[in-house]
């Protein structure tokens, strides 16, 4: 039940939990007393010494000083007394044995008020170090003539990864191997920059998107991708990057949040702290302690305890973790799982802070931080930047931070500003000089304009003109190149060049400043850390392993009841059945390891991040992943053997039972190792699954069962001996058929067992069992070595080599410079006119009011909270919310993280899929009806979910086609789409592919603007926007808000949640709704001129500090209404609002607006959706076709798989199609078709799961928006598959038919094509069906293997229809593969009446098919109908369940 609760929703409860924890502290009196100050006993002077009269304390400290060095470094004195106790004192504690409660209380005592107490703690530490005359290590980072270049492939037309473009690229790569050259271009990302980042100063990196900020941060921290070429020199304290380990010396904090979803926040940071080690803290602590002892100084107990606790290496739980979580505000969610797209966890803002916490918990002294405050409210962002400022100033750290929208208060905390644009540095110097520099260039920052916003806009072509302040001089655009040159001529720029011209004096560098060792811990400790984490993840994924075991039990039950001993005789015919049962066991255990592919591939992104940051070597990750799978593999193999051995009726000897079990265990563990190895090599889920399918195909076809080794072409027999499954087959066969009960002599003078082995080409002696076992162990070792080597030497799977269109290249290279001036003049002239033009293009809509009264929202109490003592059944997340949103009024919905902003929007928009809603919601006075409300409303979600394989323009067109009223003609729609693209400034990237978040395609801010455009183009009357400016820089945010304001001015109702508004953006809103933690309202009303009303309201509360001049009202408002202020002043802002005259006025307004206007009518539409069903289907089919055409990883890979598989089978079964003389030759041909049908289908199903799940997430958003019906979506998805499936089926027939040598008849060729086409359709539609009934890819991937058990066992090959027990015959007829093989074999051989020798008797081919397999040539028409019925049935179930089930938890 815990997964049903949103992270934002329950964050407030975490705070309450913390408060309750503090209130019941008396129950932990012993722990509490350990940390209370006893000022009556002693006082600490300014220098930290203790008064002379505290003799007892001095004696206790002397005891510690006499301890051995190691023990002394781990021992300290902590207060041991309570204010209520008459006797007080201290006790000696071991800092390595602090419990969770002790660590929590210690941090709570050290840091009550984060901003002030963190500063005090850092000052105390610095004072202690300075007092003994020590210097802290510092790092000065220099970069000279730094240039970063990307090599791109130039293509004609749009640079989109279509199947055709990808095929051409593959061919061009092959051509390059011959020495030929392709058309390439080099694009400068960073262009010849110089600079110095000094220690002890906090530097802000500003610049528009795509200006090179991230690349610069990565280059300076030594984390640049290999596909980028870097020249110039970067040095730390005079040392080049290749002279030390920059990844250990500095920390790069990415803008992307990559974490393991199954771990909690605390576990993630603890693991990071453990792997990063303590750096020089131990040496510093020992030296400080030594010098204090020499000088007779007794330190402050709190500081000593803290410094010693964070100086101990390798602890599983670190006090530093508690400290970092506290200062970043993550302590309230420390025990919550991180979660992912489909699994509830912490909020986006908390995830962003966790990314920062993961790195700063380490000992590094240089931080390069990329957009660390995205998604955070301005108050939290200020607090984090303030902590960084304190860290930089007091610890003399080197900190460079990239921010998108820093509030003025946060901006003022920085010492230096670095402004970038187009890969150049426009300014790098003191913050106080930057405005003077631009004023000298002719530009002035207006009053009440944030300086950071001004800096990002003044370098933009479209915004620069408004800041020109020379009224007597004409304005002309000042380019980035000109600004950069002016800066170099400035005294600050010249000073940088002068400093760089003199080499850094290395003798000044502290010995501990740079890290020269790659890893922080000894190998054994790294191994223990990694194996502990791997064990934790296995426990968290227990459901997967239980599900797999249950599935194995089910498969074993089916197998043993099919091959049950009562039906199995000791003869040559049933010997074939025993052989089938053994082979099936091998296949089951082989395929059981298949989920290891996706589980390994999904974690590789986090692994490569941590490997890049030198957390641990690859072997420390690989060995635990291998070792911990041994008991699982052992258990699953034992379960299978115990269930099946005696029921099937294998030889009843204990030794042979255990030998079969040991061999099956070796096969199972080898398969797990093989799939893990393939995942490490191919890295992505889709590519790994394709490779895994090839792996299964290879092991299956060369195992010696489908085609005996003697029948294989001589040049392919190596495949048999290079195959792990072959050794499993040999070992199991000799173990069973060399048993005494198979020793009956046959007419050929061989025993029955030998005869069976000979027919299968397995005539080996008993020693081959041990050879096979050793071979399997060898394969296991080999696969795990390759797994480790792949992790060690392969790089992170980045997006493929960049492609660029010729037009875009020309633009970047400046071939259009001649038109630049005229273009600029035109754009600057057009800018103010644009709004009027937009106003003319207002599509018809009906203004609507949203009112809500006494709105409450509850969810079921999470299980973990019940475990902590909460006995309530429900958890309240919104409490008595009353308000109204009116047409033409732009409303801001604000509050700290966890206040319930998104929850309120979700409830009003009808997006909640769980929980309980109370209260009254009305639209223009009428009760809200969700079906009609979806038609008139738009919702910009916080997570930007879009189809990755279509362009920006196509995404907007698609939304317009499906959501605009059908009365609007196509020309108007096209014009409106163009206008929306221009308004949101997406017109310049309209041909760019959307891509996958954090991997390829659009940047974060471009993706955010696309989300807004997709909703605006629907022309809704009501628009809800959840953090529309998060992830945007100040200029992009201003563009978006300007567009939103223009839309609101047309009479629409718009509500935006917003986190970090600048003054301009905040004051663009007309009204404000402010929530506090717990979902309670503390203000609703107008903002007023310069936010006058909101300021007056809060300043009227006694003891609230007045707002400072030019202070951001949004930040001030959040600060003065915070929970800490409420506690400090003893007030409840929700109660103050409830008792105010403003509340009474608002209540009256809501009552008034809740009544419909006279003569008005409720919203009604002739149909549920804007478009007819046919219109929906056409639009969906259009998008799906584009998406498929641009998905080479899915479509091209499966076509290649089909081609290669067909070639392998064709070569292996060369000309066997008409070579029929014995039953074995018939089995061989049957095996070829059986193998191809099964494995082409399995590959299609497995590779389709990931693709369909991605599209399903998009579908959830589009369905919520009321864009189309489930049946239209399902049919569009189903129909799009058909041409690609047909191509695969055609490949199969064209390649295999002549190679295997089937009968050359058009009739038989058609049947082959038809059978394979229906089979592949069935497998693909099965993938759709599985995705529609499962919550995530992992469960679907496991569930699919259960279907494969039936598809394999009941296909008619392993056990023919005539031998299937009566209680299972129904499953045979429900198995699609049985009908596929029936259709193929019957059509091919059902009319062949040649003589064939079957088990020593003569019969015809047609009679053998009928008597042994149950295939009737005269029933082919029935077979044809059943074959097409399977895909139709699965497609219908997909359409049904995709409409009925919703696994998105909100």
From Swiss-Prot:
One of its GO terms (biological process) is auxin polar transport. Induction: Induced by cycloheximide (CHX) and cold/dark treatment. Up-regulated in response to iron (Fe) deficiency. ATP 2 binds at residues 895-902. Residues 817-838 have a biased composition (Basic and acidic residues). One of its GO terms (molecular function) is ATP hydrolysis activity. Disruption phenotype: Defects in efflux of the auxin precursor indole-3-butyric acid (IBA) associated with developmental defects such as abnormally long root hairs and increased lateral root production. Strongly reduced coumarin (e.g. highly oxygenated compounds scopoletin, dihydroxyscopoletin, esculetin, fraxin, fraxetin and esculin) exudation in the rhizosphere, especially in iron (Fe) deficient conditions. Hypersensitivity to iron (Fe) deficiency. It is found in: Cell membrane. Residues 810-838 are annotated as: Disordered. One of its GO terms (cellular component) is plasma membrane. Expressed in roots and, to a lower extent, in seedlings. Residues 175-447, 850-1103 form the ABC transporter domain. Residues 525-737, 1175-1389 form the ABC transmembrane type-2 domain. Its main location: membrane. It holds the Pfam family ABC2_membrane_7. Disulfide bonds: none annotated. It is a multi-pass membrane protein. Together with ABCG36, regulates auxin homeostasis and responses by playing a dual role in coumarin (and derivatives) and in the auxin precursor indole 3-butyric acid (IBA) efflux transport, thus influencing roots and root hairs development. Mediates coumarin exudation in the rhizosphere, especially in iron (Fe) deficient conditions, with a strong specificity for highly oxygenated compounds such as scopoletin and derivatives, dihydroxyscopoletin, esculetin, fraxin, fraxetin and esculin; these molecules improve plant Fe nutrition. Belongs to the ABC transporter superfamily. ABCG family. PDR (TC 3.A.1.205) subfamily. This is ABC transporter G family member 37. It comes from Arabidopsis thaliana (Mouse-ear cress). The lineage of its organism: Eukaryota, Viridiplantae, Streptophyta, Embryophyta, Tracheophyta.
């Amino acid at each position: 039940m815990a997964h049903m609760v949103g992270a934002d929703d329950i964050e407030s409860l975490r705070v309450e939990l913390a408060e309750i924890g503090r209130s019941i502290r008396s129950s932990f009196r012993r722990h509490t007393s350990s940390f209370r100050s006893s000022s009556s006993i002693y006082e600490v002077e300014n220098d930290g010494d203790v008064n002379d009269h505290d003799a007892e304390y001095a004696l206790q400290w002397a005891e510690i000083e006499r301890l051995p060095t190691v023990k002394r470094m781990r021992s300290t004195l902590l207060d041991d007394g309570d204010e209520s106790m008459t006797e007080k004192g201290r006790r000696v504690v071991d800092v390595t044995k602090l419990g969770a409660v002790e660590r929590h209380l210690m941090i709570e005592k050290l840091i009550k008020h984060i901003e002030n107490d963190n500063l005090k703690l850092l000052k105390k530490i610095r004072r202690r170090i300075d007092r003994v005359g020590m210097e802290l290590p510092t790092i000065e980072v220099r970069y000279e003539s730094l240039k970063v270049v990307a090599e791109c492939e130039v293509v004609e037309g749009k640079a989109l990864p279509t199947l055709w473009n990808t095929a051409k690229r593959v061919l061009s790569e092959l051509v390059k191997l011959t020495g030929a050259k392709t058309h390439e271009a080099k694009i400068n990302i960073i262009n010849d920059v110089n600079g110095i980042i000094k220690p002890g100063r906090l530097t802000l990196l500003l610049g528009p998107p795509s200006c090179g900020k991230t690349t610069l941060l990565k280059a300076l921290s030594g984390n640049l991708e290999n596909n980028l070429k870097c020249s110039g020199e970067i040095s730390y304290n005079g040392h080049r990057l290749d002279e030390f380990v920059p990844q250990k010396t500095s920390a790069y904090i990415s803008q992307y949040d990559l974490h393991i979803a199954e771990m909690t926040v605390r576990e993630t940071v603890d693991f990071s702290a453990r792997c990063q080690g303590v750096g020089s803290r131990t040496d510093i602590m020992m030296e400080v302690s030594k010098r204090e002892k020499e000088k007779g100084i007794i330190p402050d107990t709190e500081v000593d305890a803290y410094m010693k606790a964070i100086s101990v290496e390798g602890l599983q739980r670190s006090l530093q973790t508690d400290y970092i979580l506290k200062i970043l505000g993550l302590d309230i969610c420390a025990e919550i799982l991180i979660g992912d797209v489909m699994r509830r966890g912490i909020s986006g803002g908390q995830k962003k802070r966790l990314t920062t916490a993961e790195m700063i918990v380490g000992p590094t002294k240089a931080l390069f931080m990329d957009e660390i405050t995205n998604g955070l409210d301005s108050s939290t962002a200020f607090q984090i930047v303030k902590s960084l400022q304190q860290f930089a100033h007091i610890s003399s750290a080197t900190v460079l931070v990239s921010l998108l929208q820093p509030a003025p208060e946060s901006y003022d905390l920085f010492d230096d500003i670095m402004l970038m644009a187009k890969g150049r540095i426009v300014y790098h110097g003191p913050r106080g000089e930057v405005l003077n520099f631009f004023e000298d260039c002719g530009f002035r920052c207006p009053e009440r304009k944030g300086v950071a916003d001004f800096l990002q806009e003044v370098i933009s072509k479209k915004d620069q003109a408004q800041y020109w302040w020379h009224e007597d001089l004409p304005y002309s655009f000042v380019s980035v190149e000109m600004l950069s040159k002016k800066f170099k001529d400035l005294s600050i720029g010249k000073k940088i060049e002068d400093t760089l011209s003199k080499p850094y004096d290395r003798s000044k560098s502290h010995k501990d400043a740079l890290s020269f060792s790659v890893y922080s811990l000894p190998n054994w400790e790294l191994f223990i850390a990694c194996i502990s984490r791997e064990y934790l993840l296995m426990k968290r994924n227990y459901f997967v392993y239980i599900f797999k075991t249950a599935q194995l039990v089910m498969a074993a039950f089916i197998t043993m009841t099919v091959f049950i001993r009562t039906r199995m005789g000791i003869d040559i015919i049933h010997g074939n059945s025993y052989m089938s049962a053994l082979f099936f066991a091998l296949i089951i255990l082989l395929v059981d390891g298949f989920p290891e592919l996706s589980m390994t591939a999904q974690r590789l992104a986090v692994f490569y991040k941590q490997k890049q940051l030198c957390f641990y070597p690859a072997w420390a990750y690989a060995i635990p992943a291998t070792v911990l799978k041994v008991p699982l593999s052992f258990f699953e193999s034992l379960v299978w053997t115990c269930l099946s051995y005696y029921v099937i009726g294998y030889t009843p000897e204990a030794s042979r039972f255990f030998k079969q079990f040991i061999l099956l265990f070796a096969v199972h563990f080898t398969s797990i190792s093989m799939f893990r190895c393939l995942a490490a090599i191919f890295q992505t889920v889709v590519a790994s699954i394709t490779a895994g399918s090839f792996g299964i195909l290879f092991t299956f076809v060369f195992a010696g069962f489908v085609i005996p080794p003697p029948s294989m072409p001589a040049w392919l027999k190596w495949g048999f001996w290079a195959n792990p499954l072959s050794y499993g087959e040999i070992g199991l066969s000799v173990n069973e058929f060399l048993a005494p009960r198979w020793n009956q002599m046959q007419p050929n003078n061989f025993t029955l067992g030998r005869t069976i082995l000979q027919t299968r080409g397995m005539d080996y002696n008993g020693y081959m069992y041990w050879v096979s076992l050793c071979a399997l162990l060898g394969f296991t070792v080999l696969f795990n070595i390759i797994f480790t080597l792949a992790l060690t030497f392969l790089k992170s799977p980045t997006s493929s080599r960049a492609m660029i269109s010729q037009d875009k290249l020309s633009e970047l290279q400046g071939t259009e410079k001649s038109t630049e001036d005229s273009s600029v003049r035109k754009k600057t002239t057009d800018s103010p006119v644009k709004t009027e033009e937009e106003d003319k293009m207002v599509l018809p809509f009906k203004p609507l009011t949203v009112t809500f009264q006494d709105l409450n929202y509850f969810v079921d109490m999470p299980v973990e909270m019940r475990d902590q003592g909460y006995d309530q059944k429900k958890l309240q997340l919104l409490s008595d919310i009353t308000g109204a949103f009116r047409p033409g009024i732009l409303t801001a919905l604000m509050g700290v993280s966890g206040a319930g902003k998104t929850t309120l929007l979700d409830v009003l928009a009808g997006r909640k899929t769980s929980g309980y809603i109370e209260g009254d919601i009305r639209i223009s006075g009428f009760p809200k009806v969700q079906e009609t409300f979806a038609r008139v409303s738009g919702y910009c979600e916080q997570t930007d979910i879009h189809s990755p394989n279509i362009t920006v323009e196509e995404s907007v067109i698609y939304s317009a086609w499906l959501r605009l009223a059908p009365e609007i003609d196509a020309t108007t729609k096209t014009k409106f789409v163009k206008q929306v693209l221009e308004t949101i400034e997406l017109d310049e990237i309209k041909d760019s592919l959307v891509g996958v978040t954090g991997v390829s395609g659009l940047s974060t801010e471009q993706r955010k603007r696309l989300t807004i455009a997709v909703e605006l183009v629907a022309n809704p009357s009501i628009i809800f926007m959840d953090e529309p400016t998060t992830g945007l820089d100040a200029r992009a945010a201003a563009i978006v808000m300007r567009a939103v304001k223009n839309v609101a001015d047309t009479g629409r109702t718009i509500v935006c949640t917003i986190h970090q508004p600048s003054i301009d953006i905040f004051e663009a809103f007309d009204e404000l709704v402010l929530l506090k933690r717990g979902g309670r309202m503390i203000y609703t009303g107008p903002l007023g001129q310069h936010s006058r009303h909101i300021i007056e309201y809060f300043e009227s509360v006694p003891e609230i500090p007045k707002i400072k001049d030019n202070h951001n009202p949004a930040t001030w408002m959040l600060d003065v209404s915070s929970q800490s202020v409420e506690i400090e002043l003893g007030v409840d802002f929700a109660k103050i609002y409830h008792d105010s005259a403003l509340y009474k006025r608002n209540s009256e307004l809501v009552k008034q607006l809740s009544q419909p206007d006279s003569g008005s009518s409720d919203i009604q539409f002739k149909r549920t959706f804007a478009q007819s069903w046919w219109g929906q289907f056409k639009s969906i089919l259009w998008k799906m076709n584009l998406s498929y055409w641009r998905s080479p990883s899915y479509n091209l890979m499966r076509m290649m798989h089909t081609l290669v598989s067909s070639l392998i089978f064709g070569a292996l079964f060369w000309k066997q199609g008409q070579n029929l003389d014995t039953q074995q030759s018939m089995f061989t041909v049957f095996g070829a078709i059986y193998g191809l049908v099964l494995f082409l289908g399995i590959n299609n199903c497995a590779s389709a799961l990931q693709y369909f799940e991605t599209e399903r997430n998009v579908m959830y958003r589009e369905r919520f928006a009321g864009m189309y019906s489930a049946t239209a979506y399902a049919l569009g998805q189903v129909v799009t598959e058909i041409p690609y499936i047909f191509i695969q089926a055609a490949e199969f027939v064209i390649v295999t038919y002549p190679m295997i040598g089937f009968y050359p008849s058009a009739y038989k060729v058609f049947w082959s094509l038809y059978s394979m086409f229906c089979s592949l359709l069935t497998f693909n539609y099965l993938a759709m069906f599985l995705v529609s009934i499962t919550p995530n890819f992992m469960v679907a991937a496991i569930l699919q293997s259960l279907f494969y058990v039936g598809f394999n066992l009941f296909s008619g090959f392993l056990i023919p229809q005539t031998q299937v027990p009566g209680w299972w015959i129904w499953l045979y007829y429900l198995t699609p593969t049985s009908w596929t093989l029936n259709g193929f074999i019957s059509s091919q051989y059902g009319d062949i009446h040649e003589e064939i020798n079957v088990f020593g008797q003569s019969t015809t081919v047609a009679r053998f098919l009928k008597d042994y397999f149950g295939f009737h040539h005269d029933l082919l028409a029935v077979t044809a109908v059943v074959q097409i019925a399977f895909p139709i049935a699965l497609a219908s179930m997909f359409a049904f369940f995709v409409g009925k089930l919703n696994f998105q938890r909100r």
